């Protein structure tokens, strides 16, 4: 299971005992043949629960408060500038966020030595599973489940967008769940502020949930990219299959237009690039499918909301706030229980001239914020 964001996966995994290091201040484990060294308050045993693209995840208990946590090890975190920047960005963002539907960061384990550390250990709240696992399981999902998952996702996203942040990588495996069906958004490593323009060329992003404007390399994208991803997730909850499982960008756009219809000239106005407009016009033309026939198992309200999310032109796509007011979510929606972020997030800590050593110093400081030197 890919729990690479470090929160999901309460079940499974053998317990592993460790040995004390650094005068008993730390405990060293051997997990899948990898060293896993954490502060001693995370008392043995620990339990491996996942291996993701960015490292190993273990479940543990904080002996100081009895809290169950997930600890994600990012090994050799500073070998690659892009990955180092991604790790710092996620730590800073999660520390800025404080919302029931966003995974909470609990600790950055302070390395034993400032001058000699290469691994980063991020501690977050432990969740039971993720939406990808649930969709792939045999567990029946009712319309009530669908409503509740969607409502929580939009509620968390409202908070994220109010901080001037775009998530940019929403997908079922980044949405963690517990046994009560409480949902939390995770993995902010690709997030950006709404004012930044970046074609995401640095990263391999999951293509299936990407909005048309990103597939067409539109640099002036908005919060609407996340709404498109939510629409893809909504459709997948009901059908139990990805809506647009494209093998490449060309097939991805083909699958999209086969469902929502080929865009007319007025729907291509947002594209600044003549090449992108020409490309879309020379593709095979498809009529719009009837969503009620395509999604027969979906309630009428869910179909209506899905149609408003899967709109080619981002300026015509429903916003998160409008979606929360949609009749489909009326039984859950309460404006007084949908908070916004008190302060916008800033990526000012990221300087183009930053080396891996600069990033290492900033992550060290983050670990000190959680684990300050004792007063003498």
Swiss-Prot record:
Reaction(s) catalysed (UniProt annotation): L-seryl-[protein] + ATP = O-phospho-L-seryl-[protein] + ADP + H(+); L-threonyl-[protein] + ATP = O-phospho-L-threonyl-[protein] + ADP + H(+)
UniProt-listed GO biological process terms: intracellular signal transduction
Gene Ontology cellular component terms for the protein in this record: cytoplasm; nucleus
Residues of the active site: 169 (proton acceptor)
Keywords: ATP-binding, Kinase, Nucleotide-binding, Phosphoprotein, Serine/threonine-protein kinase, Transferase
Listed SMART domains: S_TKc
Residue window of motif TXY: 201-203
Posttranslational modification: Dually phosphorylated on Thr-201 and Tyr-203, which activates the enzyme.
The Protein kinase domain, residue ranges: 43-329
Pfam families in the record: Pkinase (PF00069)
Documented activity regulation: Activated by threonine and tyrosine phosphorylation.
Enzyme Commission number(s) of this protein: 2.7.11.24
Entries under InterPro entries matching the protein: Kinase-like_dom_sf (IPR011009), MAP_kinase (IPR050117), MAP_kinase_CS (IPR003527), Prot_kinase_dom (IPR000719), Protein_kinase_ATP_BS (IPR017441), Ser/Thr_kinase_AS (IPR008271)
Domain of life: Eukaryota
Modified residues (Phosphotyrosine): 203
Phosphothreonine PTM positions: 201
Signal peptide: none
Enzyme class, spelled out: transferase
Alphabetized GO MF terms: ATP binding; MAP kinase activity; protein serine kinase activity; protein serine/threonine kinase activity
Family per similarity comment: Belongs to the protein kinase superfamily. CMGC Ser/Thr protein kinase family. MAP kinase subfamily.
Domain notes: The TXY motif contains the threonine and tyrosine residues whose phosphorylation activates the MAP kinases.
Name the record gives this protein: Mitogen-activated protein kinase 6
Organism: Oryza sativa subsp. japonica
Gene name of the encoded protein: MPK6
């Amino acid at each position: 299971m890919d729990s690479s964001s470090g929160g999901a996966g309460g079940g499974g995994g053998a317990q592993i005992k460790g040995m004390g290091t650094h005068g008993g201040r730390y405990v060293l484990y051997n997990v899948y043949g990898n060293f896993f060294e954490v502060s001693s308050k995370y008392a043995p045993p620990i339990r491996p629960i996942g291996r993701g693209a960015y490292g190993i995840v273990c479940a543990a208990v904080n002996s100081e408060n009895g809290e169950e946590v997930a600890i994600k090890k990012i090994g050799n975190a500073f070998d690659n500038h892009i990955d180092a920047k991604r790790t710092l960005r996620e730590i800073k963002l999660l520390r800025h966020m404080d919302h029931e539907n966003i995974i909470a960061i609990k600790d950055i384990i302070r390395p034993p030595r400032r001058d000699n550390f290469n691994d980063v250990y991020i501690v977050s709240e432990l969740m039971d599973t993720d939406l990808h696992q649930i969709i792939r399981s045999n567990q029946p999902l009712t319309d009530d489940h669908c409503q509740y998952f969607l409502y929580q996702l939009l509620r968390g996203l409202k908070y994220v967008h109010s901080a001037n942040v775009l998530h940019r990588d929403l997908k079922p495996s980044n949405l963690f769940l517990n046994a009560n069906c409480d949902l939390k958004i995770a993995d902010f490593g690709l997030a950006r502020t709404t004012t930044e323009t970046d074609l995401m060329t640095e990263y391999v992003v999951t293509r299936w949930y990407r909005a048309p404007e990103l597939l067409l390399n539109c640099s002036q994208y908005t919060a609407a990219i996340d709404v498109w991803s939510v629409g893809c997730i909504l459709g997948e909850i009901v059908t139990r299959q990805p809506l647009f499982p494209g093998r490449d960008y060309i097939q991805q756009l083909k699958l999209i237009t086969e469902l929502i219809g080929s865009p007319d000239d007025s729907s291509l106005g947002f594209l600044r690039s003549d090449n992108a407009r020409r490309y879309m016009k020379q593709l095979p033309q498809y009529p719009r499918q009837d969503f009620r026939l395509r999604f027969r198992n979906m309630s009428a309200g869910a179909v209506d909301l899905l149609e408003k999310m899967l709109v080619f032109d981002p300026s015509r796509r429903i916003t998160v706030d409008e979606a929360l007011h949609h009749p489909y979510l009326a039984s859950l929606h309460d404006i007084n229980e949908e908070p916004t972020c008190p302060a916008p997030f800033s990526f000012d800590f990221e300087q183009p001239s930053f080396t891996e050593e600069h990033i290492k110093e900033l992550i060290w400081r983050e670990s000190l914020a959680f684990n300050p030197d004792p007063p003498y």
